[in-house]
Structures are given as C-alpha cells and as structure tokens.
C-alpha cells in the first residue's frame, strides 16, 4: 500500500483504520504487511509506454481482535513484527459478543455460490 502521487495524499492512516475496523467487526486478529521504498515503472510496450512511481509507506502492524494495535512497524525500515494470541480467549471474546449469532446463511447462501447472482 502506497501513497498515490497523482492524488498527493498519504493514505496510511485510512488504510490502518480500515484494517483495524475489520479486526474489531469480525473479532479476529489482523496482521497487515506492507513493503517500503520507492518503486518505479519504466515505459515499455506491456504498460502502454507509461512511467510511474509509487512510494510504499511500510507501517505494517498487528491488531488484536478488538482492533487495538499490539505491534507497529515504521514507515522506512524493514522489520519483522510478531505477536502472541491466546486463541481460546479470542474465541471466547468472539462468542460473548454474539457477532455471528444472528447470521442466517440459509437465507442468502444461494447468492454466494460461484456463477450465481441476484
């Protein structure tokens, strides 16, 4: 995930908040890995003669099942992040919230099958 030069913005915060939200809404830990540095694309026939560059902003992280950060990477250094989770506790937390209690896949399962639609 990088900052798009055309948009002149830094999407790191938005990306991180979205991923933390996925962790919290599904009550599962999320590990988000990203690379660092500038990558350039030189013009060639395969890319239609376009030249571009994208700066990857690192910021890899690990969030627990509530979305809280438990490991945090930097923007410009290669790193290995680790975290340990008590999976029984994670499961207990997920069950106590009842997040999936009201799911009714038998009502919508047909539209999730390959080649099917609404």
PLM region spans:
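Short, surface-exposed linear patches
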Residues: 1, 20-24, 84-85, 93, ...
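A sequence-level detector of short, solvent-exposed, charge-rich linear segments
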Residues: 38, 42, 49, 85-89, ...
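Cysteine/selenocysteine-centered motifs that mediate thiol-based redox chemistry or coordinate metal-sulfur cofactors
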Residues: 90-118
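A short, polar/charged loop-to-alpha-helix boundary motif
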Residues: 77-95
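CN hydrolase (nitrilase-like) catalytic-core segments centered on the catalytic cysteine
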Residues: 1-81
